[in-house]
Swiss-Prot record:
<feature type="zinc finger region" description="RING-type; degenerate">
    <location>
        <begin position="18"/>
        <end position="57"/>
    </location>
</feature>
<keyword id="KW-0863">Zinc-finger</keyword>
<dbReference type="GO" id="GO:0008270">
    <property type="term" value="F:zinc ion binding"/>
</dbReference>
<dbReference type="InterPro" id="IPR001841">
    <property type="entry name" value="Znf_RING"/>
</dbReference>
<keyword id="KW-0808">Transferase</keyword>
<dbReference type="Pfam" id="PF08941">
    <property type="entry name" value="USP8_interact"/>
</dbReference>
<dbReference type="InterPro" id="IPR013083">
    <property type="entry name" value="Znf_RING/FYVE/PHD"/>
</dbReference>
<dbReference type="Pfam" id="PF13923">
    <property type="entry name" value="zf-C3HC4_2"/>
</dbReference>
<dbReference type="GO" id="GO:0097191">
    <property type="term" value="P:extrinsic apoptotic signaling pathway"/>
</dbReference>
<feature type="zinc finger region" description="SIAH-type; degenerate">
    <location>
        <begin position="78"/>
        <end position="138"/>
    </location>
</feature>
<dbReference type="GO" id="GO:0061630">
    <property type="term" value="F:ubiquitin protein ligase activity"/>
</dbReference>
<dbReference type="GO" id="GO:0004842">
    <property type="term" value="F:ubiquitin-protein transferase activity"/>
</dbReference>
<protein>
    <recommendedName>
        <fullName>E3 ubiquitin-protein ligase NRDP1</fullName>
        <ecNumber>2.3.2.27</ecNumber>
    </recommendedName>
</protein>
<keyword id="KW-0479">Metal-binding</keyword>
<dbReference type="InterPro" id="IPR017907">
    <property type="entry name" value="Znf_RING_CS"/>
</dbReference>
<keyword id="KW-0833">Ubl conjugation pathway</keyword>
<dbReference type="InterPro" id="IPR015036">
    <property type="entry name" value="NRDP1"/>
</dbReference>
Length: 318
């Protein structure tokens, strides 16, 4: 529907009026042959009833419509119009092409979003503020949160039950596998081969690393740091069968003779450059796997590997 003519200053050219609603053209389009112009909404509604021009009755369809000429758009944009919110106290008169941007910020707009300053902080249309009740709103929020918490607790209980069932299934499966292995030693060899291939695949997915500050090694990481490194190992795809072993081997109490004490590490530091190390993603830590370090002496490596954590100095080899 077009704009009410009474909102405009001065006379409006008849060519700028919609023949259907008699208002000033809004989002105007024109018929291609007769060139009569209409509001887009008006002509769309008209075509829902009949496929002819409402002025000269020539055949025309929605697909035939075209934008109006630039000169008509320029004439429309220069018209001076009063604000939609004049009835609410706005006295602004502005160009038609500036109306929409003005309406977004017009302080007299009854639907302009405002924030309650009485404590609840709810954002609502300005005309709803007089009937707003903070306590009622907050009570509704609390009820919604309680419902959401109840749903989450129900979901968590279901997941816990499913996890317990899965753990029982795993234990039964492990017992079954042990029974089969005891009856067929070849199956145990096959399982070990599969596990070894999984370890190799994971190790090959890690980025090669270089340690530039061996003196920054943290040889006695606390439980929190070990938990952080363990999470990173799991996230990187480390086979679960070796995660705990690697974390056990992150502390000097489990290290081989060549790394066991600070004095020994200082004496052997020149050999550490021979380690094939892979970076634990996102951490100042490396994993030194036995399968990649067979060239190192037995006093320098452990099965399945070592985790070395540093304060700084771990770089990826690109």
């Amino acid at each position: 529907m077009g704009y009410d003519v009474t909102r405009f200053q001065g006379e409006v050219d008849e060519d700028l009026l919609c023949p259907i609603c008699s208002g000033v053209l809004e989002e105007p389009v024109r018929a291609p042959h007769c060139e009569h112009a209409f509001c887009n909404a008006c002509i769309t509604q008209w075509f829902a009833q009949q496929q002819i021009c409402p002025v000269d009755r020539t055949v025309v369809t929605l697909a035939h419509l075209r934008p109006v000429p630039r000169i008509m758009r320029n004439m429309l944009s220069k018209l001076q119009i009063s604000c939609d919110n004049a009835g609410f106290g706005c006295t602004a008169t502005l160009r038609l092409d500036q109306l929409q941007s003005h309406l977004k910020d017009c302080e007299h707009n009854p639907k302009r979003p405002v924030t309650c300053e009485e404590g609840c902080g709810l954002e609502m249309p300005k005309d709803e503020m007089p009937n707003h009740n903070c306590i009622k709103h907050l009570r509704s929020v609390v009820q919604q949160q309680q419902t959401k918490i109840a749903d989450l607790e129900k979901t968590a209980a279901e997941h816990k039950h499913q996890l317990a069932e899965q753990k029982r299934d795993i234990q039964l499966l492990k017992a079954y596998m042990r029974a089969i292995r005891s009856a067929n030693p070849n199956l145990q060899n096959l399982e070990e081969s599969i596990e070894y291939n999984e370890i190799l695949e994971w190790v090959n997915s890690l980025q090669p690393a270089r340690v530039t500050r061996w003196g920054g090694m943290i040889s006695t990481p606390d439980a929190v740091l070990q938990a952080v490194i363990k999470r990173s190992l799991i996230d990187s795809g480390c086979p679960l069968s070796i995660v705990n072993d690697l974390i056990e081997n992150a502390h000097e109490r489990n290290w081989p003779q060549g790394l066991a004490t600070l004095e020994t590490r200082q004496m052997n530091r020149r050999y550490y450059e021979n380690y094939v190390a892979k970076r634990i993603p996102g951490k100042q830590a490396v994993v030194v796997m036995a399968c990649e370090n067979q060239h190192m002496g037995e006093d320098m490596i452990l099965e399945p590997g070592l985790v070395m954590i540093f304060a700084h100095g771990v770089e990826e080899i690109l």
